[in-house]
């Protein structure tokens, strides 16, 4: 059970169809209730590349929505991340790790087939069952509660209901001066 809420409108999300929710924390389940939602571009902090999608924005306890891959995929001439070839910063593992370092409650990666290099079926087949991780001394400090993916059309609708333009923000996210954007009145609940 998962949903976005924007103002008084709920956007229900069916597991495996619009969203895939998972966790690598110990235990049977996790739950988020009305967590604020922030668009964090590509969710990358790479000081050696003079890139920081988070700037000084506090995302502790929030769900961040991020784009898959890195900024060069759609605009290889930027050459910030070595062109179209995906760097570690573009991988889902990095995005979850960086969000955990920043105290985010969850991460929602917007799935798009070309920049991910695989279709939605791969996401659902890979993330719909139990997830396993090594035993960690302090798993809660190293993992976000919720790791998830959503279909692009769900992201577009969410942003629209929040009064934002997904494509315009996606273009802004390819710039070094991008700053995270809170989705006005938007929250996420799910388990």
Residue spans for each PLM region:
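Acidic, His- and aromatic-enriched active-site or binding-groove loops in soluble protein domains
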Residues: 130-139
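Protein/peptide-recognition domains central to ubiquitin and immune signaling
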Residues: 1-17, 96, 104, 109-127, ...
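Noncatalytic luminal/extracellular "stalk/propeptide" segments of secretory-pathway proteins
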Residues: 1-78, 180-191
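A generic "functional-site adjacency" signal
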Residues: 32, 53, 93, 149-152
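A short, structural micro-pattern
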Residues: 31-32, 101, 140-144
């Amino acid at each position: 059970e998962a949903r976005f809420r924007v103002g008084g409108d709920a956007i229900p999300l069916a597991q495996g169809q619009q969203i895939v929710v998972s966790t690598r924390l110990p235990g049977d389940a996790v739950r988020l209730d009305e967590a604020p939602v922030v668009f964090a571009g590509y969710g990358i902090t790479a000081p050696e590349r003079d890139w920081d999608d988070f700037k000084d924005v506090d995302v502790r306890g929030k769900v961040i929505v991020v784009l898959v891959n890195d900024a060069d995929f759609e605009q290889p001439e930027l050459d910030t991340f070595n062109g179209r070839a995906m760097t570690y910063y573009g991988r889902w593992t990095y995005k979850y790790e960086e969000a955990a370092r920043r105290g985010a409650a969850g991460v929602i990666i917007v799935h798009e087939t070309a920049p991910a290099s695989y279709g939605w079926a791969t996401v659902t087949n890979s993330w719909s069952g139990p997830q396993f991780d090594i035993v960690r001394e302090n798993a809660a400090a190293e993992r976000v509660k919720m790791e998830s993916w959503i279909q692009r059309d769900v992201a577009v609708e969410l942003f629209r209901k929040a009064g934002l333009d997904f494509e315009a923000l996606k273009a802004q996210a390819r710039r070094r001066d991008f700053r995270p954007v809170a989705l006005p009145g938007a929250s996420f609940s799910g388990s």
